[in-house]
């Protein structure tokens, strides 16, 4: 999971402004390994490892888009959702923009996608779409969190290793 065991790597990759696009699917739990609590699990949300629901002792849900936007490295950060056709079209546009940034060589782009998990929520697909809209949006508001047009950070003069200059500097 990007927000837990991948947290160190994603934060440092973003801070460096690496030229990649990251698409983070946030369904509020670890869906592929049994429905355990994840860093993005909502307060009160029941999971296989929090059967009584997430409580304060377990920490608040991590807002990854806001964390990424707070770093200097990323040039584009947006949170989108998939709960209706309008939102799916917005998600498509955000992903397209993030990939376009790569073709322009501008650096790190991050798109967080709020998604449904009917299996572990034990709801129908339609009910999970409503669940995302009603439960996740208040905690994870949609929208662009960062959009910069600056030049890539690596467009800086190359370091020199001229022996005389290095010796003079030290």
Regions found by a protein language model. Give the residues of each.
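Active-site-proximal loop->helix
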Residues: 7-12, 32-46
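Glycine-rich beta-alpha junction loops
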Residues: 27-29, 83-84, 113-120
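A short secondary-structure junction signal
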Residues: 6-8, 33-35, 79-80, 89-93, ...
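Structural motif
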Residues: 19-23, 29, 66, 74-78, ...
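Short, solvent-exposed amphipathic alpha-helical segments in soluble enzyme
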Residues: 10-12, 38-39, 93-97, 126-134
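Conserved thiamine diphosphate
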Residues: 38-104
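Flexible, low-complexity linker and terminal segments
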Residues: 103-170
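Thiamine diphosphate
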Residues: 1-31, 93-97
């Amino acid at each position: 999971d990007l927000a837990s065991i991948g947290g160190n790597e994603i934060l440092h990759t973003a801070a460096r402004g690496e030229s990649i696009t990251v698409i983070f699917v946030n369904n509020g739990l670890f869906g592929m390994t049994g429905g355990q609590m994840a860093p993005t699990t909502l307060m009160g949300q029941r999971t296989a490892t929090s059967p009584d629901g997430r409580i304060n002792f377990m920490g608040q849900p991590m807002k990854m888009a806001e964390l990424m936007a707070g770093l200097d490295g990323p040039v584009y950060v947006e949170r989108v959702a998939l709960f209706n056709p309008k939102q799916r079209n917005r998600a498509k546009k955000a992903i397209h923009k993030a990939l376009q940034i790569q073709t322009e060589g501008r650096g790190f782009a991050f798109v967080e996608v709020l998604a449904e998990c009917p299996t572990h929520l034990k709801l129908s697909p339609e009910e999970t779409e409503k669940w995302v809209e009603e439960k996740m949006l208040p905690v994870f508001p949609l929208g662009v969190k960062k959009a910069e047009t600056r030049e890539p950070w690596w467009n800086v003069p190359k370091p020199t290793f001229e022996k005389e200059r290095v010796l003079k500097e030290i």
